[in-house]
Amino acid sequence: MMTALETRLSVADGTHAAALRQRLQAALAECRRELARGACPEHFQFLQQQARALEGGLGILSQLTED
């Protein structure tokens, strides 16, 4: 049984997966820019966790779309 996300990602034209990938990549790029600027230790740790979560999301998306 496929999840709702897997169903949406299985659409033949792949527009949903491409749009989702683009949004995740943009969010990750912004997070990395903030990390490069520096922050207080608590905010820096939060940004690192956010970057790891976004990278994980991109990895899952790649597995689901078999890129």
From Swiss-Prot:
Database matches in Gene3D superfamilies: Immunoglobulin FC, subunit C (1.20.5.420)
Consequence when changing L20S: About 50% loss of ability to lyse macrophages
This protein's GO CC annotations: cytoplasm
Phenotype of null mutants: Deletion mutant looses the capacity to lyse macrophages, indicating the absence of a functional T3SS.
GO biological process, one term: protein secretion by the type III secretion system
Outcome after substituting C40G: In strain: 388
Pfam families documented for this protein: T3SS_needle_E (PF08988)
Coiled-coil stretches noted in the UniProt entry, renumbered to this chain: 16-37
Domain of life the protein comes from: Bacteria
Keywords: Coiled coil, Cytoplasm, Virulence
Keyword Coiled coil: yes
Cell compartment(s), UniProt: Cytoplasm
Membrane recorded as keyword: no
Major subcellular site: cytoplasm
Subunit architecture: Forms a stable ternary complex with PscF/SctF and PscG within the cytoplasm. Co-stabilized by PscG.
Family: Belongs to the YscE family.
Function comment: Chaperone of the type III secretion system (T3SS), also called injectisome, which is used to inject bacterial effector proteins into eukaryotic host cells, facilitating the establishment and dissemination of infection. Along with PscG, prevents premature polymerization of the PscF/SctF needle protein within the cytoplasm. Required for type III secretion needle assembly. Also required for cytotoxicity by influencing PscF/SctF levels.
Entry protein name: Type 3 secretion system chaperone PscE
Taxonomic lineage of the native organism: Bacteria, Pseudomonadati, Pseudomonadota, Gammaproteobacteria, Pseudomonadales
